[in-house]
Amino acid sequence: KKNVAAVTTSVFVKNAKIVIQRLQQIEYIITAWNRKLLQYLNSIYVTPGPMSLYRKDALIRVGGFDEKNLTEDIEIAWRLMRYRYKIKMSLDSKVYTNVPKTLKGWWHQRTRWSIGGLQTTSKYFHLFLNKSFSNLGMFLLPFFSVSYVISILGLFLFSYIIFNWLFGFIYFFIAYYK
């Protein structure tokens, strides 16, 4: 179809041997099905780097990839939607990718994804709740914005719980051995 600018595929973890890789494999499978569902809302928000196909004329029309964005695969998807293109998901095709093997590597990857997502959200925030841009303005931007707020609140809550637990443990330890 003329208005389809990109097609993305299912991404699977290559050689998932350890627990952290197997957990990511489950995450990637769920994400693939989520993308398929989001296709019906014209809201596929990312065209993952391991394997996405683009129409050359559409990429040229929107100005190509933003090389300064940490998550250019999210940014290009949003830009294509801004220009009224559609992105499709093919569950029939699949690609395998390497994922982090350590918690530290996973943390670095997710930090990069979060910062890039914030870059993209701030770049397109002027479309927030803008009906002219359909699901980009009415669904994706509000969803991403709320998810960032919830993530930050969750981080503070988690930190508060850990701090209280540590403080309680130290207080108990001091009181018990005094």
Describe each model-derived feature in a short phrase:
Residues 16, 97-98:
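Generic structural signal for helix capping and beta-alpha/helix-loop junctions
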Residues 2-70, 111-114, 118-122:
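Long helical/loop segments within the catalytic core of UDP-sugar-dependent glycosyltransferases
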